[in-house]
Structure formats: C-alpha cells, structure tokens
A protein has these predicted regions:
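NAD(P)+-binding Rossmann beta1-loop-alpha1 motif at the extreme N-terminus of oxidoreductases
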Residues: 2-49
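Short, well-ordered alpha-helix to beta-strand connector turns
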Residues: 29, 81-82, 114, 163
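N-terminal glycine-rich dinucleotide-binding loop that anchors FAD/FMN and/or NAD(P) in oxidoreductases
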Residues: 50-69
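Short acidic low-complexity segments
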Residues: 67-81
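Glycine-rich, N-terminal phosphate-binding loop of Rossmann-like dinucleotide-binding domains
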Residues: 87-88, 121, 170
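Rossmann-like NAD(P)(H) cofactor-binding subdomain of soluble oxidoreductases
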Residues: 92-153
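Internal alpha-helical scaffold of NAD(P)-dependent oxidoreductase catalytic cores
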Residues: 110, 132-145, 151, 157-189
Length: 189
C-alpha cells in the first residue's frame, strides 16, 4: 500500500541519530519537523551549520531544506504530526531514564489523536507496557512501534536504505501501518 506523504516529527531530531534520519525522511517528500531542546544546535541548523560530520549529511540537509524542513525546541510543535519518532540517546542511568520519561510524557500530552509513535531509542524493558497503559495513549488512540536504530554513527545515511528494519508492534494491523511508512521512505521492512 502506498503511504501518502505525512507530517513527521523527530524528537531528539538534531542528534547523531535524529538529524540524519530527519533529513533522509524529508528527502523522501514527507513534511518533517526536527524537535530538539538544544537551542544552540537548532540555531546553528537555521544558519546551515551542521553539528557533526556524517557521510552525505550536507547533501541530505540541502534536500531537506528544499522540502521545507522545520526546526523547533518545543514539543508542542508535534501537534499536527501523523508520525512521531523518538530518537533520544538513552542509558540505564537514573538521570537519563528521568529525561526519557519526561520527554515521553510531553509527547503523549502533545500528540494528536490517532498519531503513530516510533521509538528508535534503546529503552528499558517495561517502557512499552508503561506507554500502552498510559491514560493519554489510550484516550488518544495512539499506535506504537519499537523500531530500534542499528546503524553506525557517521554512516547512517549510507546504511538506512540497506539495513533491514525491525518493527515491533502489538498486532498485524499496526505492523502494516508502520511497514507502509518505512516503505514510503525506502527503508526495508
């Protein structure tokens, strides 16, 4: 099934995982909003200053700008997103878990009805269950997929279209939704 071009927000979108992914998705014609709390990096991106080296990132950034990629430091900017991708760096440290949980709460508060959330971050084992039991998640009829990032930093734009994509979901109908999205950006399912 061909997926129409969607509004996509990438949380942590200016980081080593999020920025290449955001640019790649925008280059496929989706309307992308990069959401990142790091104001300095967001301002540098507005001035076309990329925060790190990545093979082909400059090229994809130019393509993303042609497709009017948006930049924001506010989670509220996801309010029109059909797909919300979370790409935060994470670890088992209590501080990192609290940051991740806070971002997740912000996402659930601001996500529009029936939007689809893709977790690409490494997460604790109980995270999926915790999200699916969240009152806002249920009330808003959100969908959730765990699609871990498995690419090499610095080579992600080379590996994205060739690395098989793991899609962890609750049932077959949800699998189809997320598989169609990944196929729309030429990432193998």
């Amino acid at each position: 099934m061909k997926v129409p071009k969607s509004n996509v927000s990438v949380i942590g979108g200016a980081g080593h995982i999020g920025l290449p992914l955001s640019c790649y998705i925008a280059s496929k014609g989706h309307k992308v909003t990069i959401v990142d709390i790091n104001e300095n990096i967001i301002n540098n991106l507005r001035d076309d200053k990329l925060p790190f080296n990545e093979v082909n990132l400059q090229h994809y950034w130019k393509e993303a700008k042609k497709n009017k990629i948006k930049l924001s430091t506010k989670t509220q900017s996801i309010k029109d997103s059909e797909f919300i991708i979370i790409t935060l760096g994470s670890s088992s440290k209590t501080k990192d878990i609290k940051i991740f949980d806070k971002v997740l709460d912000d996402v659930l508060q601001n996500a529009p009805l029936q939007s689809k959330i893709i977790l690409r971050s490494t997460i604790n084992i109980d995270t999926i269950e915790k999200i699916e039991k969240n009152k806002l998640f249920v009330q808003k009829n959100l969908k959730l997929a765990y699609c871990p990032e498995r690419i090499a930093e610095g080579m992600s734009l080379e590996e994205l279209p060739t690395m098989p994509q793991i899609i962890g979901v609750k049932d077959d109908s949800e699998y189809r939704i997320f598989k169609d999205f990944f196929e729309s950006i030429d990432i193998l399912g």
